[in-house]
């Protein structure tokens, strides 16, 4: 009986930039900042490009606004990633073990810090800390599955 099959593979390009700050904590924090900051900046550019194409024209004001938004988003999300990675690494060093609890604690502290920096009230800070912990823990569990 004749059979046909299809096979293929998909691999993503990988780019690693290493900046040696002389301290593993700083190395991981800067790495997280740069990687997530670049993703946020790229997302911002893609979103603004979509809106410009939809509008049908571009002005120097649109370009300047897009560039400012790209830098702002990259710095914001990069800083959040840097705090999270730094907290997770710090907890790992203190506890002496690497597991999902480090991610949970890092996510909780990062969520609380971001919320407090946004001048939210105590209840909202607590909810954001729980959300940060839940997201970080879920991401860690998903990484264990793959």
From Swiss-Prot:
<dbReference type="Pfam" id="PF02466">
    <property type="entry name" value="Tim17"/>
</dbReference>
<keyword id="KW-0472">Membrane</keyword>
<dbReference type="InterPro" id="IPR045238">
    <property type="entry name" value="Tim23-like"/>
</dbReference>
<keyword id="KW-0406">Ion transport</keyword>
<feature type="region of interest" description="Contains 4 beta strands">
    <location>
        <begin position="1"/>
        <end position="73"/>
    </location>
</feature>
<keyword id="KW-0626">Porin</keyword>
<keyword id="KW-0150">Chloroplast</keyword>
<feature type="transmembrane region" description="Helical">
    <location>
        <begin position="128"/>
        <end position="146"/>
    </location>
</feature>
<dbReference type="GO" id="GO:0009707">
    <property type="term" value="C:chloroplast outer membrane"/>
</dbReference>
<keyword id="KW-1134">Transmembrane beta strand</keyword>
<keyword id="KW-1133">Transmembrane helix</keyword>
<dbReference type="GO" id="GO:0046930">
    <property type="term" value="C:pore complex"/>
</dbReference>
<dbReference type="GO" id="GO:0045037">
    <property type="term" value="P:protein import into chloroplast stroma"/>
</dbReference>
<keyword id="KW-0934">Plastid</keyword>
<comment type="similarity">
    <text>Belongs to the Tim17/Tim22/Tim23 family. Plastid outer envelope porin OEP16 (TC 1.B.30) subfamily.</text>
</comment>
<dbReference type="GO" id="GO:0006811">
    <property type="term" value="P:monoatomic ion transport"/>
</dbReference>
<feature type="transmembrane region" description="Helical">
    <location>
        <begin position="75"/>
        <end position="91"/>
    </location>
</feature>
<comment type="function">
    <text>Voltage-dependent high-conductance channel with a slight cation-selectivity; selective for amino acids but excludes triosephosphates or uncharged sugars. Non-essential amino acid-selective channel protein and translocation pore for NADPH:protochlorophyllide oxidoreductase A (PORA) and possibly PORB.</text>
</comment>
<dbReference type="GO" id="GO:0015288">
    <property type="term" value="F:porin activity"/>
</dbReference>
<comment type="subunit">
    <text>Homodimer and oligomers in membrane.</text>
</comment>
<keyword id="KW-1002">Plastid outer membrane</keyword>
<protein>
    <recommendedName>
        <fullName>Outer envelope pore protein 16, chloroplastic</fullName>
    </recommendedName>
</protein>
<dbReference type="GO" id="GO:0042803">
    <property type="term" value="F:protein homodimerization activity"/>
</dbReference>
<keyword id="KW-0813">Transport</keyword>
<feature type="transmembrane region" description="Helical">
    <location>
        <begin position="103"/>
        <end position="119"/>
    </location>
</feature>
<keyword id="KW-0812">Transmembrane</keyword>
<dbReference type="GO" id="GO:0015171">
    <property type="term" value="F:amino acid transmembrane transporter activity"/>
</dbReference>
<dbReference type="GO" id="GO:0034426">
    <property type="term" value="C:etioplast membrane"/>
</dbReference>
């Amino acid at each position: 009986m004749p059979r046909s099959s299809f096979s293929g593979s998909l691999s993503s390009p990988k780019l690693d930039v290493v900046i040696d700050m002389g301290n593993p904590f700083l190395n991981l924090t800067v790495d997280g900042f740069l990687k997530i900051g670049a993703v946020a900046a790229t997302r911002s550019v893609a979103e603004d490009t979509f809106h410009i194409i939809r509008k049908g024209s571009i002005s120097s004001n649109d370009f300047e606004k897009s560039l400012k938004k790209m830098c702002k988003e990259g710095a914001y999300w990069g800083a959040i990633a840097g705090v999270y990675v730094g907290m997770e690494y710090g907890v790992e060093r203190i506890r002496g073990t690497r597991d999902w609890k480090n991610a949970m604690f890092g996510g909780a502290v990062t969520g609380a810090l971001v919320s407090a920096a946004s001048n939210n009230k105590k209840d909202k800070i607590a909810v954001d800390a729980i959300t940060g912990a839940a997201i970080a823990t879920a991401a860690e569990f998903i990484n264990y599955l793959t």
